[in-house]
Curated annotation (Swiss-Prot):
Signal peptide boundaries: 1-24
Domain of life: Bacteria
Organism the protein comes from: Neisseria meningitidis serogroup A / serotype 4A (strain DSM 15465 / Z2491)
Record protein name field: Type IV pilus biogenesis and competence protein PilQ
Keyword Membrane: yes
Length: 761
C-alpha cells in the first residue's frame, strides 16, 4: 500500500513539474539602469519564474535579440526609446509560442544574461576592441547564497558576442551563437535547440578566417512596433541596387533583380498572430530574381527605407478611419509635423497663422478675406494638425505649391479653381491641333479600337475621355499605325498610354508528353514520389466523373522532396501536380520505365504560345463516312471525313507572382463498332475533360484515368478429334486475355524569356 501511495505521489510531482515547465509566464515590466565601464542592465520582470532566454547578436545593424519560449507580454507600452550612447530602443513582440525582445544598439555590443527568480537581468556593454586583453568576466559574480536560496532562485549566466573574436580566456566565459537569423513567427524546433546548444560549446574562429569566408545570404525578419505596425527587415548581402516595389491587391511584392536566392533559403512566415496589417511574409526565388511577398489585410500604408547597401526595412502602418478631415468626404489624414503646444485666448487668426509659419518653416500667405479671432488651447499636437483645426473652425482651405501655402476662405479658392479649369477648357477648345502617328510594335492596332472605344464616339455624344471634342483617331491596319489628331496635351496622354500597353507579351513553352502505361504504373509512380494535395481551382468532370483533388497544399517548405498525387483510386483522383524542382526526376523515371517496357511514349509535342493565347495539339486520323442526302426526289451520296484524334488544348495565364494557371481541354476519340438495328456500323467513341489548375513555373500537371481494355478469347483444338462431343474437350485449349492500359498526359509549362528556360531538344 505504501509503495502504491509513493508511486502516486511521485507521479503527481512529475506532472506538476511538467505543468510548471510548460506553463507560460508574462513579461510585465522592463527597467534599464547604468553600471560603471559603460555597461547597461536591462531588468525584465515576469509574473512567474522563467527559463534562460536564447538569442543572437548582429553587428550591422547593431542589435541583440532574445527569445523567451512559452512567454507572453503584458505591458501597455511595448516600444521603449532611450537617449543613450549604447542603447537606443527596446521592442517587445510575441506570437502564440514565444516572446522576443529586440535591443537596438548605437554600436556593436555583447551581452550576458542572469535569471534571478522571476527576473532576467541582461548586462550590455560595447564589444571589446582589444583582442589580446586579459580575460575578465563581463559581469561580476553574485555572492554565494545558501543552498536553500540557490535552490529557490537559480542563477544562470550566458554571454554572446559576434562582432569581435574571442580570446581563449573569453571562450571560457562566453560562447558565441552561430545562428544569424531567428524568425519570430516560427518556434524553435528541437533540432535547432540542439544546434544552438552545440554552437555554445564551440570556440570562435580567428578574425582573419571569418573575414575570408563572408556569409552572403538573404534573410528576413519580422517584428511589431508600438504603433501596431508590422516591420519586415530584409538583408540581401551582395545586392547593391534598389528593389522594385509593386502592389497587387492585398500583396506587396518586392523584387530584387538578378539576385539569385538559394532554394534552401526560401521560407514563409505566418505572422497573423501579431495583430498587425501584415498576415504573411514569403521569401522565394523567381528565376534569377528574389521576391519578397508581403500579404496584408485591412487599410494600411507602406514606409520603406534602406539602412545600408543590402539592408531594407519595410514598415506597414495601419490606417485608422477617424474624423480627421479636410473636406466633405471625411477622408482620413496623417499628420507628421513637429509637435507644438498653443494656448491663446481671443487672438487674431492671422497671428496664429504667423506662429504656425515660424514653427513649420513654411511660407504661409493669407488672403485679405482671412480675419477674425479665436481661442485655442492645444498641447503636444503636430503643427499641421493645428493648422487643419484652425482652417476647419473658420471655413478656410489651403493650396500648396512647393514651400508656399496659400490660405483663403473655401468658397474663394473654389471659385479660383473653377476659373482656372474653365480657362484650360477654353484653351483646349481654341488651341491648335496637332497630328501624331504611333506605329505599334507588339500589339495589334485593332486591339486599341476596343481599348479606346473608338466605335462609340459620336452617336450619343459620349466620346472617349482620352480624346477631346475636336480630336480624332484613325487606324491603319496595313501599317499597324494609330493616327491621332488633337491638342498637344491629349497627344502626350496617348504617348504615355501606348508606352505602357505596347509591350511584348510573355510567352509560355508548353511541353506535353502522352504516355501509354501498364495498369498500376500510376499507383507505383505516386508511391515513389509521395502524395500531397489540398486545394483546387476549378474542374469540369462531366465526361468521366473525374475529380481534381491536388494542388499546392499548406506546406511552405522548399526542399528537394517531390509533390505528386497519384493515389491508388486513380478513377477518383486523376489530376495531379509535380513541383518544378521534381520535374527532372519525373522525366528520368518515365525514361527508365519505358526502357523496362512499363510505358510507351506515344507523342512528345512542344508548342510555344503567348500569355492567355490558346495552344492546340492533335494526334490521330480522319475516318471516312458515307452520307446520303435526298433532295428534289433524288438522292446523292457523299463521303465526309470525321476526326478521331487525341487532342490537347491549353490556355496559359501567367499570374503576377510567376505561377501559371492553365485551362486544359482533353478529348480522346477512337473508332468503335456500334449496333444499329441488325447491323453493326462504324462510329466514334469520344471522351472529354475540361479542367483548370495552377502550376508553378516548370512544374508538371499530370492527367490520367483514361483506360483502354483489350479482351480476347482463344480456342486451340486438334482437327477432327476436337469436334467429338464431350470427348473433344480433351483435345481443346481455351485461353482468355485481358490487357488493360492507362493513358497518362504530362503537361509542363515554362515561362520563356528568362535565364534557365531556354529551348531544350
Amino acid at each position: 500500500m505504501n509503495t502504491k501511495l509513493t508511486k502516486i505521489i511521485s507521479g503527481l510531482f512529475v506532472a506538476t513539474a511538467a505543468f510548471q515547465t510548460a506553463s507560460a509566464g508574462n513579461i510585465t515590466d522592463i527597467k534599464v539602469s547604468s553600471l560603471p565601464n559603460k555597461q547597461k542592465i536591462v531588468k525584465v520582470s515576469f509574473d512567474k519564474e522563467i527559463v534562460n532566454p536564447t538569442g543572437f547578436v548582429t553587428s550591422s545593424p547593431a542589435r541583440i535579440a532574445l527569445d523567451f519560449e512559452q512567454t507572453g507580454i503584458s505591458m501597455d507600452q511595448q516600444v521603449l526609446e532611450y537617449a543613450d550612447p549604447l542603447l537606443s530602443k527596446i521592442s517587445a513582440a510575441q506570437n502564440s509560442s514565444r516572446a522576443r525582445l529586440v535591443l537596438n544598439l548605437n554600436k556593436p555590443g555583447q551581452y550576458n544574461t542572469e535569471v534571478r527568480g522571476n527576473k532576467v537581468w541582461i548586462f550590455i556593454n560595447e564589444s571589446d576592441d582589444t583582442v589580446s586583453a586579459p580575460a575578465r568576466p563581463a559581469v561580476k559574480a553574485a555572492p554565494a547564497a545558501p543552498a536553500k536560496q540557490q535552490a529557490a532562485a537559480p542563477s544562470t549566466k550566458s554571454a554572446v558576442s559576434v562582432s569581435k573574436p574571442f580570446t581563449p580566456a573569453k571562450q571560457q566565459a562566453a560562447a558565441p551563437f552561430t545562428e544569424s537569423v531567428v524568425s519570430v513567427s516560427a518556434p524553435f524546433s528541437p533540432a535547432k535547440q540542439q544546434a544552438a546548444a552545440s554552437a555554445k560549446q564551440q570556440t570562435a574562429a580567428p578574425a582573419k578566417q571569418q573575414a575570408a569566408t563572408p556569409a552572403k545570404q538573404t534573410n528576413i525578419d519580422f517584428r511589431k512596433d508600438g504603433k501596431n505596425a508590422g516591420i519586415i527587415e530584409l538583408a540581401a548581402l551582395g545586392f547593391a541596387g534598389q528593389p522594385d516595389i509593386s502592389q497587387q491587391h492585398d500583396h506587396i511584392i518586392v523584387t530584387l533583380k538578378n539576385h539569385t536566392l538559394p532554394t534552401t533559403l526560401q521560407r514563409s512566415l505566418d505572422v497573423a498572430d501579431f495583430k498587425t496589417p501584415v498576415q504573411k511574409v514569403t521569401l522565394k526565388r523567381l528565376n534569377n530574381d528574389t521576391q519578397l511577398i508581403i500579404t496584408t489585410a485591412g487599410n494600411w500604408e507602406l514606409v520603406n527605407k534602406s539602412a545600408a547597401p543590402g539592408y531594407f526595412t519595410f514598415q506597414v502602418l495601419p490606417k485608422k478611419q477617424n474624423l480627421e478631415s479636410g473636406g466633405v468626404n471625411n477622408a482620413p489624414k496623417t499628420f507628421t509635423g513637429r509637435k507644438i503646444s498653443l494656448d491663446f485666448q481671443d487672438v487674431e487668426i492671422r497671428t496664429i497663422l504667423q506662429i504656425l509659419a515660424k514653427e513649420s518653416g513654411m511660407n504661409i500667405v493669407a488672403s485679405d478675406s482671412v480675419n477674425g479671432k479665436m481661442t485655442l488651447s492645444l498641447k503636444d499636437v503636430p503643427w499641421d494638425q493645428a493648422l487643419d483645426l484652425v482652417m476647419q473652425a473658420r471655413n478656410l482651405d489651403m493650396r500648396q505649391q512647393g514651400n508656399i501655402v496659400n490660405i483663403a476662405p473655401r468658397d474663394e479658392l473654389l471659385a479660383k479653381d473653377k476659373a482656372f479649369l474653365q480657362a484650360e477648357k477654353d484653351i483646349a477648345d481654341l488651341g491648335a491641333l496637332y497630328s501624331q502617328n504611333f506605329q505599334l510594335k507588339y500589339k495589334n492596332v485593332e486591339e486599341f479600337r476596343s481599348i479606346l472605344r473608338l466605335d462609340n464616339a459620336d452617336t450619343t455624344g459620349n466620346r472617349n475621355t482620352l480624346v477631346s471634342g475636336r480630336g480624332s483617331v484613325l487606324i491603319d491596319p496595313a501599317t499597324n499605325t494609330l493616327i491621332v489628331t488633337d491638342t498637344r496635351s491629349v497627344i502626350e496622354k496617348f504617348r504615355k498610354l501606348i508606352d505602357e500597353l505596347d509591350v511584348p507579351a510573355q510567352q509560355v513553352m508548353i511541353e506535353a508528353r502522352i504516355v501509354e502505361a501498364a495498369d498500376g504504373f500510376s499507383r507505383d509512380l505516386g508511391v515513389k514520389f509521395g502524395a500531397t494535395g489540398k486545394k483546387k481551382l476549378k474542374n469540369d468532370t462531366s465526361a468521366f466523373g473525374w475529380g481534381v483533388n491536388s494542388g499546392f497544399g499548406g506546406d511552405d517548405k522548399w526542399g528537394a522532396e517531390t509533390k505528386i498525387n497519384l493515389p491508388i483510386t486513380a478513377a477518383a483522383n486523376s489530376i495531379s501536380l509535380v513541383r518544378a524542382i521534381s520535374s527532372g526526376a519525373l522525366n528520368l523515371e518515365l525514361s527508365a520505365s519505358e526502357s523496362l517496357s512499363k510505358t510507351k511514349t506515344l507523342a512528345n509535342p512542344r508548342v510555344l504560345t503567348q500569355n492567355r493565347k490558346e495552344a492546340k495539339i492533335e494526334s490521330g486520323y480522319e475516318i471516312p463516312f458515307t452520307v446520303t442526302s435526298i433532295a428534289n426526289g433524288g438522292s446523292s451520296t457523299n463521303t465526309e471525313l470525321k476526326k478521331a484524334v487525341l487532342g490537347l488544348t491549353v490556355t496559359p495565364n501567367i499570374t503576377p507572382d510567376g505561377q501559371i494557371i492553365m485551362t486544359v481541354k482533353i478529348n480522346k476519340d477512337s473508332p468503335a463498332q456500334c449496333a444499329s438495328g441488325n447491323q453493326t456500323i462504324l462510329c466514334i467513341s469520344t471522351k472529354n475533360l475540361n479542367t483548370q489548375a495552377m502550376v508553378e513555373n516548370g512544374g508538371t500537371l499530370i492527367v490520367g484515368g483514361i483506360y483502354e481494355e483489350d479482351n480476347g478469347n482463344t480456342l486451340t483444338k486438334v482437327p477432327l478429334l476436337g469436334d467429338i462431343p464431350v470427348i473433344g474437350n480433351l483435345f481443346k485449349t481455351r485461353g482468355k486475355k485481358t490487357d488493360r492500359r492507362e493513358l497518362l498526359i504530362f503537361i509542363t509549362p515554362r515561362i520563356m524569356g528568362t535565364a534557365g528556360n531556354s529551348l531544350r531538344y
